[in-house]
Amino acid sequence: MSKYRGPRLRLVRKLGKLPGLTSKISKKTNTPGEHGQPQNKLLKNRSPYGLRLLEKQKLRFNYNITERQLLRYVKQAKNLTGSTGEILLAILEMRLDNIVYRLGMAPTIVAARQLVSHGHILVNKQKVNIPSYPCQLKEVISVKDKKASRDLVKKFVQESAVNPVPSHLSFNKENLVGIVNNVATREWIGLQINELLVIEYYSRN
């Protein structure tokens, strides 16, 4: 299944806030469709399977990844020691496109993906154009030393100044340089998600 390229606010109305996909908030409170209902009412009427599916979709669309990618990350998380749900979230948070977004270099994960794909971002002074690249501890994230690249990222940094940089990262706004100091923790996810239901979804399918 490919990445979503449709109306973003339509997804927000259906799934709730998706900060990685869009910072906009829909003025409409009902879910999409002719017979749309308030989200709270819809949640009460959902079956256990429907709730698991909803959480899975929230995670996939927020991080803008394909079904195949998410399944691969779930399998990876299951093979590691610890809480599978929290490990899954940490894996997603350590993707390069998400790190760029968390540093404030881009307003959304979607925009961060574009920066990475177009070669604007460096990891340890080397160009990395793979959004899914898994960042490691102490890696340095910076911007290509070209005026167009730096001007673009500076603009994004100014726009995202109200959002704090997570505690596992550090960022120098003047030099546009970030460092991965630690693994992402649950408290900085910024998405209302029940990751255990996501794990259950794949365990039952």
UniProtKB/Swiss-Prot annotation:
Residues 28-42 have a biased composition (Polar residues). Residues 94-157 form the S4 RNA-binding domain. GO terms for molecular function: rRNA binding; structural constituent of ribosome. Signal peptide: none annotated. GO terms for biological process: ribosomal small subunit biogenesis; translation. Keywords: Chloroplast, Plastid, Ribonucleoprotein, Ribosomal protein, RNA-binding, rRNA-binding. One of the primary rRNA binding proteins, it binds directly to 16S rRNA where it nucleates assembly of the body of the 30S subunit. With S5 and S12 plays an important role in translational accuracy. This is Small ribosomal subunit protein uS4c. It comes from Tupiella akineta (Green alga). The gene is rps4.
